[in-house]
Amino acid sequence: MISVRDVSKRFGEKLAVDDVTFEAEQGSITYLLGPNGAGKTTVMRMIAGLTRTSSGTISVNGSGLRDFRDTISEIGFSLGAFARNPGHTAEQHLRWQARLGGLTTSDIGPVLYRVGLDQVAKRPVGKFSYGMLQRLGIASALLGDPKTLVLDEPANGLDIEGIIWLRELLLGLAAEGKCLLVASHNLTEVEITGTRVVIMGKGKVLSDTSKDELVTAGSGPRPLESAYVAITKDSVEYAATGGTR
């Protein structure tokens, strides 16, 4: 479980995250949505301990991140597809992460197989496609079989097969009782897999409700999309008129 309580973050004069509160529960897929610049990535970096909060508290499975003696079994992160040494193979990349987490190298093979990279385990990641890098990031998050996972835009760069694979993976992990917090712009996947949806805009929480309640609030042939657009209409930094004049 992830609990974010009254969290704010300032970068100089800019208030990037403003009094954000929400929870992501075990056995569920909680999506964090919002326009570019809404503060989603900053929130995720604060959960990961990469950015300090200016105020408020964050707990994971009832404890602060620094209180864990075995963090890798509590929470896993995939926050950027390019946080890799391009000269390392996929196997080497996971090996040093496993060692840092106190795991053995025997934990690496099953994870590479689960994300579909077992056949390219000895290929340098500098030769990976964007979609393969996304799979490697998810493999990193899965090391240690953590109770909680935080994934930032995991579907970016995936082809159709990859999106279907990711969908089944997320649903399977939730069915195992894991807590998943996922930032996304893919409303189709949110509608298929989501349990709860938190929508941010300009650093604030604009909506925090179940996926089903959000869909019910929408209208037309794409109700989730219509509800999202209505909620975020005053928070879009780069608005355009599309094909109209």
At which residue positions do the language-model features occur?
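Helix-to-loop junction immediately C-terminal to a conserved catalytic motif
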Residues: 48
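Helical segment within the ABC ATPase nucleotide-binding domain
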Residues: 163-176
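A short, surface-exposed alpha-helical micro-motif characterized by mixed small hydrophobic
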Residues: 190-192
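Catalytic Walker B motif of ABC-type/P-loop ATPase nucleotide-binding domains
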Residues: 149-153
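Conserved ABC ATPase "signature" region
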Residues: 95, 99, 105-121
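Conserved ABC transporter NBD signature motif
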Residues: 56-71
